[in-house]
């Protein structure tokens, strides 16, 4: 991919978007808890080949903008104009002091752009100098007259739906905008149209059907439903386990053999951390508890390693088409000290479950010398598991 200093992005967010309803500019409304403009800017701000993101906003919306995109790295917003064309021109001029080679121009109302589409845009602009993402027209199109009578049926094989980000050599599109401003042309609805008017050949590259523009209240309702379906049925389960100390020189905790002056009194290896996690996962599935799946009266589990139990619980999630979102376990004991072992425990649980370490938390506390853990008679553990299951045909997960 090209050097990251070569490409900048303009995010056009100066419009009012009143057709979308909601009582304010649509780019500051939320979808699944995130502002639309955050969703549309974030992929550019984190793309390795985009060195600068130049937002364009209404001066009246600065406070809304700063709140909506908190945490993203971007240039100070340029002031938007009365039309989209004027807003883009403002963004182009704002980049002039540190001019990029390639500029991507993206509508803030397109909240589903992704890194792959951005990469395709950069490559297309490098290859052609002016390019627009498109998707095929699948409906039959009718051309009508002033009284809405059909005049023609264009061949849809020659038609495409244009999207953003549209990609250009910066110097070429800047000059096209400057010329349009000099000649009083402010009626272009996208930047590809300005490039065409200026005599440039505009290529196309593969767009993305999901990269739709949010325009009407119905668009927001539909996309909220779609995003909710993608999240699936989110469930949480909790678990608790305790084992008393007995004779021995080690204990098993979160999959690790930990030297200690006592051992556990247990049917299996007594790993309270993993047992609590197993119960939490089974609870999220509404699938009984560890004792119902691995009865302590069954001799086959005598001395069994608890990683088998955890793998079994994970397999139960996968068998229902689900996945683990997060696992958390809290160890409650005076000794052994958990702090020095915390990262090794996280890594061991990650190894057993196949999850990234970033989705596993291991915490520790004491009971302030109260109760059986305070008297060092044993160890307790609590756990929490968050899982996602797919929705079934009746709107419920299986």
From Swiss-Prot:
Keywords associated with the record: Isoprene biosynthesis, Lyase, Metal-binding, Multifunctional enzyme, Nucleotidyltransferase, Transferase
Family assignment from sequence similarity: In the N-terminal section; belongs to the IspD/TarI cytidylyltransferase family. IspD subfamily. In the C-terminal section; belongs to the IspF family.
Coiled-coil ranges per UniProt: none
Residues at the site labelled Positions MEP for the nucleophilic attack: 156, 213
Annotated pathway: Isoprenoid biosynthesis; isopentenyl diphosphate biosynthesis via DXP pathway; isopentenyl diphosphate from 1-deoxy-D-xylulose 5-phosphate: step 2/6; Isoprenoid biosynthesis; isopentenyl diphosphate biosynthesis via DXP pathway; isopentenyl diphosphate from 1-deoxy-D-xylulose 5-phosphate: step 4/6
EC number from the UniProt entry: 2.7.7.60, 4.6.1.12
Catalytic activity as recorded in UniProt: 2-C-methyl-D-erythritol 4-phosphate + CTP + H(+) = 4-CDP-2-C-methyl-D-erythritol + diphosphate; 4-CDP-2-C-methyl-D-erythritol 2-phosphate = 2-C-methyl-D-erythritol 2,4-cyclic diphosphate + CMP
Short name of one Pfam family: YgbB
Residues that hold a divalent metal cation according to the record: 241, 243, 275
Organism the protein comes from: Rhodopseudomonas palustris (strain BisA53)
Listed name of the protein: Bifunctional enzyme IspD/IspF
Function comment: Bifunctional enzyme that catalyzes the formation of 4-diphosphocytidyl-2-C-methyl-D-erythritol from CTP and 2-C-methyl-D-erythritol 4-phosphate (MEP) (IspD), and catalyzes the conversion of 4-diphosphocytidyl-2-C-methyl-D-erythritol 2-phosphate (CDP-ME2P) to 2-C-methyl-D-erythritol 2,4-cyclodiphosphate (ME-CPP) with a corresponding release of cytidine 5-monophosphate (CMP) (IspF).
């Amino acid at each position: 991919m090209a050097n990251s200093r070569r490409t900048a992005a303009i995010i056009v967010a100066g419009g009012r978007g009143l057709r979308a309803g909601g009582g304010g500019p649509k780019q500051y409304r939320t979808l699944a808890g995130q502002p639309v403009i955050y969703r549309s800017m974030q992929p550019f701000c984190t793309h390795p080949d985009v060195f600068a993101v130049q937002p364009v906003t209404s001066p009246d919306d600065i406070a809304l903008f700063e709140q909506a995109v908190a945490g993203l790295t971007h240039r100070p917003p340029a002031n938007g104009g009365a039309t989209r064309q004027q807003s883009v021109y403002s963004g182009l001029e704002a980049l002039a002091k540190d001019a990029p080679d390639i500029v991507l121009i993206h509508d803030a109302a397109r909240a589903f752009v992704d890194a792959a589409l951005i990469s395709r845009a950069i490559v297309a602009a490098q290859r052609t100098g002016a390019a627009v993402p498109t998707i095929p027209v699948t409906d039959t199109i009718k051309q009508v007259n002033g009284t809405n009578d059909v005049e023609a049926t264009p061949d849809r094989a020659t038609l495409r739906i244009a999207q953003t980000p549209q990609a250009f050599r910066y110097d070429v599109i800047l000059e096209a905008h400057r010329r349009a401003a000099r000649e009083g042309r402010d009626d272009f609805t996208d930047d590809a149209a300005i490039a065409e008017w200026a005599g440039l050949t505009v290529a196309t590259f593969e767009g993305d059907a999901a990269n739709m523009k949010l325009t009407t209240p119905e668009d927001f309702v539909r996309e909220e439903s779609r995003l909710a379906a993608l999240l699936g049925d989110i469930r949480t389960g909790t678990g608790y386990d305790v084992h008393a100390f007995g004779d021995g020189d080690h204990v098993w905790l979160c999959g690790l053999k930990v030297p200690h002056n006592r051992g556990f009194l247990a049917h299996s290896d007594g790993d309270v951390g993993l047992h609590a996690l197993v119960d939490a996962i089974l609870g999220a599935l509404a699938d009984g508890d560890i004792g119902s799946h691995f009865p302590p009266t069954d001799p086959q589990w005598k001395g069994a390693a608890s990683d088998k139990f955890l793998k079994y619980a994970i397999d139960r999630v996968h068998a229902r088409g689900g996945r683990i979102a997060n696992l958390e376990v809290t160890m409650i004991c005076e000794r052994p000290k958990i702090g020095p072992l915390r990262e090794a425990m996280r890594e061991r649980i990650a190894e057993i479950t196949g999850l990234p370490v970033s989705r596993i938390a291991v915490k520790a506390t004491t009971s302030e010398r109260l109760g059986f853990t305070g008297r060092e008679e044993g160890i307790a553990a609590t756990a929490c598991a968050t899982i996602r299951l797919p929705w079934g045909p009746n709107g419920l997960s299986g």
